[in-house]
Amino acid sequence: MLRAFALDPIGTVSIEEMSSVGLLKLSTRTYWRRVWPAGVGLASYIVERFGTEGLRDRDVLDLGCGVGLVGIVCGRLGARVTFLDREAGALAAVRRNCRRNGLAPARTIGGDWNHGGHRVEPDAYDLVVGGDVVYDDLEWPAIGTALMRTLRAGGIALLADPGWVVQRKLRGAFRRSGFTVSRSRRRVSWPPWRTTHLRTKDINIYELGRQPTLSPKGRGQGEGFTSRARSVS
């Protein structure tokens, strides 16, 4: 199923979903086949947060990329994007969706990021994005470790959640992992490809900041982003 997402000012992003799997048959191994509200909210937030120039020539990692909406939006904004997912089918879908949206061939990495089984270069990314990757609080320490390993000093992660997690608990977990934590909220209409019978969903966007170091190593380190989210209380 081909879905179209209108995101000014970059225009329409077309994403192929693997919608042959019905909702009742979804499992953690098939969630990647669909675009979910958190991904739509995160994509919209990224466009507003960075505009048309804020991600140009930045290195971005789409963590648990699924069919690739969020990473493709970053690519349309001029970023160099790496897509990471444990499912080979997801990475194949990303490659098709990148071609569909006029992007260069996608750089993809297969692996289970939350158990250290991936091959992501350390200290290589200015921004890490992830929609619906924080639903299991038992995985938060592993996510924190992965983010600390992959982000450059001064880099940030943007993680989207549709209200499944306890905010204060998440804040504490990632602060213990060494990050600053702030939050924004994005309201999305769902499903976005309809004009009637829409529901609204509030999406929490958590911004995790890795502090710059005094002697950054590698391209772009220490050239961090300015936070625009409000602190979580």
Q: Language model features by range: what are they?
A:
Residues 218-222:
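Glycine-biased, low-complexity coil/linker segments
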